[in-house]
Amino acid sequence: MPHPRRYHSSERGSRGSYREHYRSRKHKRRRSRSWSSSSDRTRRRRREDSYHVRSRSSYDDRSSDRRVYDRRYCGSYRRNDYSRDRGDAYYDTDYRHSYEYQRENSSYRSQRSSRRKHRRRRRRSRTFSRSSSQHSSRRAKSVEDDAEGHLIYHVGDWLQERYEIVSTLGEGTFGRVVQCVDHRRGGARVALKIIKNVEKYKEAARLEINVLEKINEKDPDNKNLCVQMFDWFDYHGHMCISFELLGLSTFDFLKDNNYLPYPIHQVRHMAFQLCQAVKFLHDNKLTHTDLKPENILFVNSDYELTYNLEKKRDERSVKSTAVRVVDFGSATFDHEHHSTIVSTRHYRAPEVILELGWSQPCDVWSIGCIIFEYYVGFTLFQTHDNREHLAMMERILGPIPSRMIRKTRKQKYFYRGRLDWDENTSAGRYVRENCKPLRRYLTSEAEEHHQLFDLIESMLEYEPAKRLTLGEALQHPFFARLRAEPPNKLWDSSRDISR
């Protein structure tokens, strides 16, 4: 890339010819040029790397999609998929261009530095409590953000004279989650979600808070298995949300267990709770839109270790399969605007891909994909390309209904009323070798296994109007033994009733 500041404007207007002036400073210019090109190459490489993390197309079209289903590969491959696939919802279309322009502008660093200083001075003048102590005033003066907008904190720091930070639990594009001691709740441990000081993430947090407040209002006793919000506040530009402290996500437990599938009795209990929780949302005219194993957390992820003689390795078995549904940042009420694209790629319903409009049935499709993943240990649709995704659906579930094909605006995926897909290409061979009809994934011919796949098939019905509702799902024969359990025993987080 050319260096726009290679020659200073003052040199152009100096006395003597341009060539003579250049020769007189030739040695110095060479030194400056080599240093500049080296640092620019480093900055350019960092900028390109960061762009690949943000870019949707740079991942969707990569040859890595052709790889076979490697379970460890699947875990890293899906990590940041949601923000890539959402596109404009999370990253402006002109974000990269403005970023490069600013990096090349000579005055950008000084402007950014002055803005940071101004922001810090403004923060130092704020007061969040009339009864603030001298200790909290000293803390307020030291509040700073890192380059990405994360709050800089240390173990032992206090927020709002209430939350004492104990450890970091995780990090995402939105911010970080820390474990805290809540000194107004008798020293109880809570999870505190600290949002980046970036406006689009702060706005998403406000929307999530609105949803969580409605959930608390409708379910004050927290009987419907959605994560409970205790409190929220604005801390120096960072939206903070306090939740009940939970265990690992069902995906992280699966990954830590070498992608060993959950036993069918545990699949049954987790699936039943998931249907119950999401049915509660649907009954209150709310669609989650981002259901996936990462957003389903164990209440307590303690486990027992057993040694598998056949595989010669330790295997984990979670002690309690009680779960909670989390992450309502994308949840949408029926009356609100519906974004064109929702859901993480692997759990995205066909009506979303084909842009036919969506509502609660898209959650049911996601649940079907999740239950399958619990049963086999890997994702059903491992892809990042729309056409390939549709080809996988046809390979596993049969042809897409002609009525959906006629209605969609995405005619580029079809030819003469059928999916435009060549099985003789590398992509075609990949789908043919790694996907098979749904029932061929059965690991046992026992009746309960066939009942499970009957449930999954009903959830993966192409047409939303024909797809199983969650009220109907809870009455499915696969859940018969759980329906016989008293409610107080069914949701007891200290007891595993799935065996």
Swiss-Prot record:
The modification Phosphothreonine is found at T127, T344. One of its GO terms (biological process) is protein phosphorylation. It is found in: Nucleus. 5,6-dichloro-1-b-D-ribofuranosylbenzimidazole (DRB) inhibits autophosphorylation. TG003 inhibits its kinase activity and affects the regulation of alternative splicing mediated by phosphorylation of SR proteins. Residues 22-33, 112-127 have a biased composition (Basic residues). It is an enzyme of class 2 (transferase). This is Dual specificity protein kinase CLK2. Dual specificity kinase acting on both serine/threonine and tyrosine-containing substrates. Phosphorylates serine- and arginine-rich (SR) proteins of the spliceosomal complex. May be a constituent of a network of regulatory mechanisms that enable SR proteins to control RNA splicing and can cause redistribution of SR proteins from speckles to a diffuse nucleoplasmic distribution. Acts as a suppressor of hepatic gluconeogenesis and glucose output by repressing PPARGC1A transcriptional activity on gluconeogenic genes via its phosphorylation. Autophosphorylates on all three types of residues. Phosphorylation on Ser-34 and Thr-127 by AKT1 is induced by ionizing radiation or insulin. Phosphorylation plays a critical role in cell proliferation following low dose radiation and prevents cell death following high dose radiation. Phosphorylation at Thr-344 by PKB/AKT2 induces its kinase activity which is required for its stability. The phosphorylation status at Ser-142 influences its subnuclear localization; inhibition of phosphorylation at Ser-142 results in accumulation in the nuclear speckle. Belongs to the protein kinase superfamily. CMGC Ser/Thr protein kinase family. Lammer subfamily. Pfam families: Pkinase. One of its GO terms (molecular function) is identical protein binding. The modification Phosphotyrosine is found at Y99, Y153. The modification Phosphoserine is found at S34, S98, S142. Its main location: nucleus. Gene3D superfamilies: Phosphorylase Kinase, domain 1, Transferase(Phosphotransferase) domain 1. Its EC number is 2.7.12.1. It catalyses: L-seryl-[protein] + ATP = O-phospho-L-seryl-[protein] + ADP + H(+); L-threonyl-[protein] + ATP = O-phospho-L-threonyl-[protein] + ADP + H(+); L-tyrosyl-[protein] + ATP = O-phospho-L-tyrosyl-[protein] + ADP + H(+). The keyword ATP-binding applies. GO terms for cellular component: nuclear body; nuclear speck; nucleoplasm; nucleus. Transmembrane segments: none annotated. Keywords: ATP-binding, Kinase, Nucleotide-binding, Nucleus, Phosphoprotein, Serine/threonine-protein kinase, Transferase, Tyrosine-protein kinase. It comes from Homo sapiens (Human). The active site is at D290. Residues 1-67, 101-143 are annotated as: Disordered.
